[in-house]
Amino acid sequence: MAVGAALILSALVLLLHNRYADARAGREAETLLAGVEAAISSQADEPEETRRQETRPTGEENGTEPTATEALDPEMPVAMLEGYGYVGYVEIPALGLKLPVMSDWDYTRLEIAPCRQFGSSRKDDLVIAAHNFESHFGRLKEMSLGNTVTFTDMAGIVNTYRAEMIETLSPKDVEAVQNSGYDLVLYTCTRDGQERVAVFCNRTIAEKE
């Protein structure tokens, strides 16, 4: 009986710890997001049409003139905030999420904000990993096909995507996310840490204004 009580107490302590860590991560991300948005706004005097990238730059393939975005440096600009680099922010309206994205990843960074693990939005191979906090990517499994995702880089370029596939993967299946063939991949751990939830996205076709 004593053993059972100890296990229940341990589970309760773990639950409270996780909730505290989740709330703290949410607050930190909100503060950092404000800094990222401020850094982007500081160079917002550029013409809007030179800062938007809502369609895939395939001028030669579709017979049209190459777009201005084709000349972009494939490496995304990085801004330093509180000792860490950031490449922009990701927004998932269906989940009510808007989060800063760090330029590099490790487990310490994942406790703070989502991280760019591989690729670049300018090469259509961006992979963003995040902790399974509710305030980060813990609700990815709730997304539906067709949901919109946007990623805004530090130059203010807005990239708009559509969720095309949602999969549960093995932690060892790195190739599936790193070389998926999709323009954007979002992923996180399942609650038990045994698997990964990944959302594979492609760019949308920009609406004509």
Where are these regions (language model features)?
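Solvent-exposed, non-transmembrane regions of membrane-associated and secreted proteins
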Residues: A2-E209
